[in-house]
Every structure is written in C-alpha cells, then in structure tokens.
Design a protein with these regions (language model features):
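Polar, enzyme-active/binding microenvironments
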Residues: 1-160
Length: 160
C-alpha cells in the first residue's frame, strides 16, 4: 500500500478497513491487512482466528479489540481516535477499547502482514474493498459501512 503509519499517520487518528467476501476456516492463521514494526508496534485486521476477530490500530503488542466471530464475511474497521482510544466495527456491530499508541515503522500490506519488511500470514480471503485514513467516530464508521455495502451491492458482491 505504501502507507507507513510512522510517516503517514497522524498521532491519535488512524483507521483501516477491509471488506471480506469469503469466510475461511476458524483455525486458519491469516492476517488480512497490517504491519508490525520494531518493539511490536502493530496495525492490523485479523478477521477470523480461533473464531475471533482482532482489530488493532497503531498499538503496542496486545493492544487490540477482540470479539467472537464465526463468519469472516463482512466489513471490518479498526480505528484510533486518540492516543488511548481504539474502536472497531464488523458491519454495524461496534466495539471500543483502550490501548497505548505506537506507530508501526513499516508499510501496511493488504492480504498479509508486513513484519519488519517480510510478508507473513497470507490471507486467501477475497477483498472487495479496503481503506486507510484518519480516525473515524462511531457515526462515521456506520456511515462508511452503509456506503461500502451499497457500493458492493450495486456490483453484485455484497455479503451483509
């Protein structure tokens, strides 16, 4: 993507999103989008691992939101709106949490995680849409979900 959080992100304001058309198995080790830099600075979306979703936006290792997720199809957003506040969303279900901010110094990969310059945990899920940008409020995440779902429905590939 050429998006490097330590260079391109604004402190306390970042988001990533990923629209998955396929689900995959619960035990598959795949990371759908992300980067991990030195000192475990992480920015990643892990849609389904052990039937959970992990959403992490510019956090130190373990600074993620996790929730049960048995179907990987849908639209996922990981966001940071301050140095400590993180949020996330699957379709219209929202999650909140806190995590210390730490910007990854490696570019973000789509379809895998960039770990200190090496791609790993490749995903075989079909990506129908992805974004990277400034942090999103709860209302903005819901609006973005509506826009992206309508777009994918118009193309005959919506899954919500």
């Amino acid at each position: 993507t050429f998006y490097q959080p330590s260079t391109n992100a604004t402190a306390g304001s970042n988001h990533m999103s990923y629209y998955s058309r396929t689900t995959g198995g619960a035990a598959e080790s795949m990371i759908d989008m992300g980067s991990q830099g030195t000192s475990f600075r992480e920015n990643q979306i892990i849609i389904r691992f052990s039937n959970n979703v992990y959403l992490e936006s510019n956090s130190v290792a373990g600074g993620y939101i996790t929730a049960a997720n048995t179907n990987a199809q849908g639209y996922y957003i990981a966001t940071r709106t301050s140095n400590t506040a993180i949020g996330g969303q699957k379709n219209t279900t929202q999650y909140t949490g806190t995590a210390t901010e730490s910007l990854s110094n490696y570019v973000t990969y789509l379809g895998a995680r960039n770990r200190s310059g090496t791609a790993e945990y490749f995903s075989n899920r079909e990506c129908a849409f992805a974004t990277i940008g400034t942090g999103l409020s709860a209302a903005q995440m819901l609006t973005l979900n509506i826009i992206v779902e309508r777009y994918n429905d118009a193309l005959g590939r919506g899954v919500q």
